[in-house]
């Protein structure tokens, strides 16, 4: 952070993915690797930039249509019992899912937590633009590479080139996915505090406000609960690092 001398206009938070075999492994922060990779660094980066007055305009947080679900593909919407701080914390350390941890399912819940943190930040910092965007189902990325081999093969060589184009509104090129980010940053039609992604049940096409059909996104208490849960792990990680330094003499 000390090397950033000039204020930054735009930050795109695109770190993350399904991770792969180590997704459930617990990190020093207390989050599992899936949550830490998708959330931890993003949150710390943005909040440190704000603290140092080094962020001028926009934060774009990358989410996914997996949050509201895609019925045609059998992807169910994220459905939490209470969206309490404790429940979000259980998502972030993986205990929410019990012994049968499925990284693809957990990914949607982790993205929901990151999305809700972003929406909470939009209310906390009204002079900045905090917008959430899904790039949609985009060809030509390395996103499938962390999937199990059979699923990776099906997605890359069957679903993407053959099945999705036949279904309509389910896939697009890398340029189209990137344009979603550019539009959300530069076009005033896209407002702070909103999650924009494909129309309900789709993975491509026009972007719409997801809260029109996934109403939990509007719940400000849920948003703040996600924020509080994330900071539980940030504070734990900082304490852990401090304690480790004392024991090692650093």
Residue ranges and their predicted role:
Residues 1-144, 235, 241, 245:
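Rossmann-fold NAD(P)H-dependent dehydrogenase/reductase core
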Residues 23-27, 95-97, 157-160, 203-209:
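Surface-exposed beta-strand-to-loop junctions
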Residues 34, 169, 215-218:
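Pocket-edge positions in alpha/beta enzyme catalytic cores
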Residues 55, 143-147, 187-192:
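Glycine/proline-rich active-site loop of Rossmann-fold NAD(P)-dependent oxidoreductases
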Residues 98-104, 137-139, 143-175, 211:
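Alpha-helical membrane-targeting segments
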Residues 124, 132-146, 194-215, 247-249:
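C-terminal/domain-terminus segments
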Residues 160-211, 222, 228, 232, ...:
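C-terminal helical subdomain
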Residues 218-220, 224-250:
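Intracellular terminal tails of multi-pass secondary transporters
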């Amino acid at each position: 952070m000390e090397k950033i001398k000039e204020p930054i206009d735009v930050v795109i938070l695109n770190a993350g993915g399904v991770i792969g075999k180590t997704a459930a492994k617990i990190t020093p922060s207390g989050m599992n690797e899936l949550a830490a990779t998708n959330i931890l660094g993003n949150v710390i980066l943005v909040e440190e930039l704000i603290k140092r007055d080094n962020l001028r305009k926009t934060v774009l947080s990358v989410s996914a249509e997996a949050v509201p679900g895609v019925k045609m593909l059998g992807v169910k919407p994220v459905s939490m019992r209470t969206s309490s701080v404790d429940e979000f914390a259980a998502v972030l350390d993986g205990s929410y899912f019990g012994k049968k941890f499925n990284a693809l399912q957990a990914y949607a819940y982790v993205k929901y937590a990151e999305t809700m943190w972003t929406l909470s930040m939009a209310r906390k910092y009204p002079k900045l633009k905090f917008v959430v965007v899904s790039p949609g189902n985009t060809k030509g990325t390395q996103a499938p590479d962390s999937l199990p081999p059979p699923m990776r093969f099906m997605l890359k060589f069957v679903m993407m080139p053959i099945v999705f184009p036949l279904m309509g509104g389910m896939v697009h090129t890398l340029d189209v996915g990137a344009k979603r980010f550019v539009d959300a940053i530069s076009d005033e039609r896209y407002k702070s505090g909103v999650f924009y992604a494909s129309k309900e049940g789709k993975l491509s096409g026009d972007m719409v406000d997801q809260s029109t059909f996934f109403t939990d996104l509007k719940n400000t208490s849920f948003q703040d609960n996600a924020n509080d849960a994330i900071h539980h792990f940030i504070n734990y990680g900082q304490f852990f690092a401090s304690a480790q330094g004392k024991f090692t003499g650093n």
